């Protein structure tokens, strides 16, 4: 159908050119937006069309210089294909969208094919007389005029949405691959069978002879008790507190000293006390917070032996595994080592333990004010198995400790309860070892 057959208004609509000074404005019907415009075509879009406002096209177009500022000119870049002409699993060919920038496009050609890792190549567009196909855009009044010159001589590249989706999938694959490589490069550290655990993972326990150099005179009683103490340590480890009722947070300042210096200081202070004919009160071997609940372990019937039986006790007054003791500071300002309050030395009774009374003697008339239910020592010293304080008592194995005076004697029932609790704790530890 020729132009002469149309009305003058229709002829004006069909015969317009993008470079005309005046474009038709009596357009009654606008066109639908075309995503793949090809060949020599013209379209009139509404100014409200969002795609026309953005000058979109599925062809890879870039802006080119134009002497007319009212007209936007775009040229086709062609398509990037695989030099091996490979296909995906779905049977599609690899037609990538060329980059807009010249340097980015040159860099893109040096990359490998995303499907077969083959080299890529660019197929330029030569559909307009040996030149790229050109698109023209012009805004005039209520319409947007579009005109294409030339016919594309190459396959259609992937759209922008498809290119963005492909890049996103590539990033996801790269992230998963890098994470898997990191997992393989840093496997979990697992302990080998029979491997000794590190010291940081072991509980805090006191070894039997940890850093203490003992004189030859003290080796015999300690070595005799070493197997028993080691077996107790193997069965039950205490976190630096030997009170079964709970850990004690208070600690004596002298516990931070070097063991050798601590031993020498205590040896010196003990020698001064012995020279003044004052003797230490032996520590109570079982001071617990739950003393009221342990009254059932009192009396001789529970122990099953007489209080004057010396075969059960060691030749020195303190056992190796002693419990926390209350040490009061010395009244002399020149002495800084913890000492116990000395008592008046009465007449010595050979053949009897210093904690027990003379058989047939009078009962004790006064009691030492000691509250076992709320025992909070002013200065509490945690005595481990290798405590140098214990060694000072062993320095006088031949000396017999005298009975305490009547003015400061312990009540017989309280002493029996303390000794019964000590015996009960030893039996409980042995039972735990046998169960383990």
From Swiss-Prot:
DNA-binding region: 14-169
Signal recorded as keyword: no
Cysteine disulfide partners in this protein: none
Residues that bind Zn(2+) 1: 76, 125, 152, 154
One GO cellular component term: transcription regulator complex
Bilayer-crossing regions: none
PROSITE patterns listed in its UniProt record: GCM
Keywords: Developmental protein, DNA-binding, Metal-binding, Nucleus, Transcription, Transcription regulation, Ubl conjugation, Zinc
Keyword Transcription: yes
Protein name, as recorded: Chorion-specific transcription factor GCMa
């Amino acid at each position: 159908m020729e132009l002469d057959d149309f009305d003058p208004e229709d002829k004006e609509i069909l015969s317009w050119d993008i470079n005309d000074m005046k474009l038709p404005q009596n357009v009654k019907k606008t066109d639908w937006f075309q995503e793949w415009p090809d060949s020599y075509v013209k379209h009139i879009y509404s100014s409200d069309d969002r795609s026309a406002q953005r000058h979109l096209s599925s062809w890879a177009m870039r802006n080119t210089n134009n002497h007319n500022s009212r007209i936007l000119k775009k040229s086709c870049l062609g398509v990037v294909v695989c030099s091996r002409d490979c296909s995906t699993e779905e049977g599609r060919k690899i037609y990538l969208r060329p980059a807009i920038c010249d340097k980015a496009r040159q860099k893109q050609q040096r990359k490998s094919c995303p499907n077969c890792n083959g080299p890529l190549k660019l197929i330029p567009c030569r559909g307009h007389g040996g030149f790229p196909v050109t698109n023209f855009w012009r805004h005039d009044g209520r319409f947007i005029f579009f005109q294409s010159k030339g016919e594309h001589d190459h396959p259609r590249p992937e759209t922008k949405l498809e290119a963005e989706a492909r890049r996103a999938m590539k990033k996801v694959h790269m992230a998963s691959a890098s994470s898997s490589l990191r997992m393989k490069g840093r496997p979990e550290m697992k302990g080998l069978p029979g491997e000794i655990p590190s010291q940081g993972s072991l509980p805090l326990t006191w070894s039997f002879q940890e850093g203490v150099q003992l004189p030859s005179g003290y080796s015999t009683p300690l070595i005799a008790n070493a197997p028993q103490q080691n077996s107790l340590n193997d069965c039950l480890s205490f976190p630096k507190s030997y009170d079964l009722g709970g850990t004690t947070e208070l600690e004596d300042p002298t516990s931070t000293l070097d063991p050798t210096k601590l031993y020498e200081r205590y040896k010196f202070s003990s020698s001064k006390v012995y020279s003044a004919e004052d003797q230490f009160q032996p520590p109570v071997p079982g001071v617990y917070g739950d003393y009221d609940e342990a009254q059932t372990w009192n009396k001789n019937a529970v122990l099953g032996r007489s209080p004057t039986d010396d075969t059960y006790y060691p030749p020195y007054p303190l056992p190796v595994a002693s419990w926390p003791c209350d040490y009061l500071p010395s009244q002399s300002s020149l002495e800084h080592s913890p000492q116990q309050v000395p008592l008046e030395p009465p007449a010595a009774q050979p053949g009897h333990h210093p904690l027990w009374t003379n058989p047939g003697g009078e009962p004790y008339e006064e009691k030492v004010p000691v509250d076992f239910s709320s025992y909070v020592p002013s200065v509490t010293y945690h005595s481990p198995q290798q405590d140098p304080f214990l060694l000072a008592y062993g320095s006088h194995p031949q000396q017999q400790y005298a009975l305490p005076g009547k003015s400061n004697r312990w009540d017989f029932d309280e002493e029996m309860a303390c000794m019964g609790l000590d015996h009960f704790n030893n039996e409980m530890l042995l039972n735990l070892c046998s169960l383990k």
